[in-house]
Amino acid sequence: MLSISVKEFLIWKKKQLSKGGDQQTFAVLLDCIGGLTASDLNLMSINLEGKLHLKKKLEFLESVWHDHLLNSCPIQYLCGITFWRDLKLKVTNKVLIPRPETELIVDIVFNIFRNKSEKLYFAELGTGSGAISIALALAYPLSKGVATDIDQDALEIATKNYINSSKQSNLKFCCGNWWSPLESFQGKLDLAISNPPYIPKDTYEKLPKEVKNFEPKVALLGGCLLYTSDAADD
């Protein structure tokens, strides 16, 4: 644990941001591996003579920031973790980084099933890091869930995230393409959810480098296939 004055930290932070990048991404770095939350950063201005306690040395944080600026690799991948809702999740380039907008899926479920003691049977198709299913499994402890993904590496990450986030055993993971692992659950599900690939090919080519060059293509590219399917139905 490194102790540093607020004034010294702010000088260092200003120097790092002068190299490039933005405040929001830098805050993610500090939160993920520096041990400084957004609340900590907001409170700094109150007492400039105070002390901060960092989990990592400034030199290490600086090297991670340098790698991000040099290669456009997402900070979350460089840190190996991300925070989503109240979860701390392991992420690698085998899984999509959970976005804040994805929280809306969980919120919609909460609005439909308001009783948290309800015994739901839910499934998630294309779970990735497991974020959505883990959030639901924790919120509805009496429920049972199954999360699928076509990528075994992604499922291993999702499983680790579940083990690290919960002492419960109400969620399991199955490898397979969309509905195929769920045939035995036919007629038993109360809820099926998914945040599927939806980016059309022409849009995918225009995505920022940090997305296109690092996040899994299979988790992003899907809009063209959906369009083809719709056209076939016509």
Language-model segments: residues:
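N-terminal auxiliary segments of SAM/dcSAM-dependent transferases
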Residues: 2-79
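SAM-dependent Rossmann-like transferase core, predominantly class I methyltransferases
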Residues: 62-140, 145-160
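Conserved SAM-binding strand-loop segment of SAM-dependent methyltransferases
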Residues: 167-178
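Short conserved loop adjoining the S-adenosyl-L-methionine
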Residues: 178-186
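Short SAM/SAH-binding signature in class I
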Residues: 189-194
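Mobile active-site "lid"/loop adjacent to the S-adenosyl-L-methionine
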Residues: 198-226
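Conserved small/polar residues in nucleotide/adenosyl-binding loops
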Residues: 227-234
